[in-house]
Structures are given as structure tokens and as C-alpha cells.
Curated annotation (Swiss-Prot):
HAMAP family noted in UniProt: Ribosomal_uL14
Keywords, comma-separated and alphabetical: Ribonucleoprotein, Ribosomal protein, RNA-binding, rRNA-binding
This protein's name: Large ribosomal subunit protein uL14
PANTHER family (alphabetical): 50S/60S RIBOSOMAL PROTEIN L14/L23, LARGE RIBOSOMAL SUBUNIT PROTEIN UL14M
Any single GO BP term: translation
Organism: Maridesulfovibrio salexigens (strain ATCC 14822 / DSM 2638 / NCIMB 8403 / VKM B-1763) (Desulfovibrio salexigens)
Family of this protein: Belongs to the universal ribosomal protein uL14 family.
Length: 122
């Protein structure tokens, strides 16, 4: 469950390390984002000489949350951290690698490129 001012780790090799949510997309009164939702983020920490600079405002998709996600079969899944993957204007990932597992819900949200790059889909 991600809201404005939430701090997230970056799960790709774009060069950003930490981002902060500044908007949850999908309606004017929408407050929370979960796995597969698109948010607008500001880069708070970045590696030197990377594709993404500190202070950059970008879109990102949430790939892991500490808040559990209910599945249709009655099971739940949750992760140890809140993580996102940075996106460009055409909704493709900025990085070329994804670190750590991602949730299966990304497949239904249409992020097949991220699912195929991820080492594990839970």
C-alpha cells in the first residue's frame, strides 16, 4: 500500500536507488497504490554517472509491497520491502535488468517486459 510521500527502493539498474511517491495515478481522489499500479516518483538517491539523476520526476510501477495482496484462490503474498521499477514515457522500463522477485499481478496489469526480465515471479 503506497501513498504520497512513501519511500520505495528501485528494483532495476537504471541507477536510481531510492524514490519517493509524489502522486498515485488513476483518479483524482485515489489515495493508495498496490502491485501493478503506476505512480509518479521523484528520485531521492541515484548512483553517479547513471541514466537517472537525483531530482528527476518519472513514472514507476510498483512491483513489491509490504502490505499483503489477496489472490483469487484465497492465498496472500507480501514482500520484505516496497519496490518500484522506473518507466519511460512509453511505459517501458528504463533499466535493462530487474532485481529480486516480482508479483504475478504484473502480468495481468500488462507489464510483460518486466515479468520477462525478472529472475522470479511469485
Amino acid at each position: 500500500m503506497i501513498q504520497v510521500e512513501s519511500k520505495l527502493d528501485v528494483a532495476d539498474n537504471s541507477g536510481a536507488k531510492k524514490v519517493s511517491c509524489i502522486k498515485v495515478l488513476g483518479g483524482s481522489k485515489r489515495r493508495y497504490a498496490s502491485v501493478g499500479d503506476i505512480i509518479v516518483v521523484s528520485v531521492k538517491e541515484a548512483m553517479p554517472h547513471s541514466k537517472v539523476k537525483k531530482g528527476a520526476v518519472m513514472k514507476a510501477v510498483v512491483v513489491r509491497t509490504k502490505k499483503e495482496i489477496g489472490r483469487p484462490d484465497g492465498s496472500y503474498i507480501k514482500f520484505d520491502n516496497n519496490s518500484a521499477v522506473l518507466l519511460n514515457n512509453s511505459m517501458d522500463p528504463v533499466g535493462t535488468r530487474i532485481f529480486g522477485p516480482v508479483a504475478r499481478e504484473l502480468r495481468g496489469a500488462g507489464f510483460m517486459k518486466i515479468v520477462s526480465l525478472a529472475p522470479e515471479v511469485l
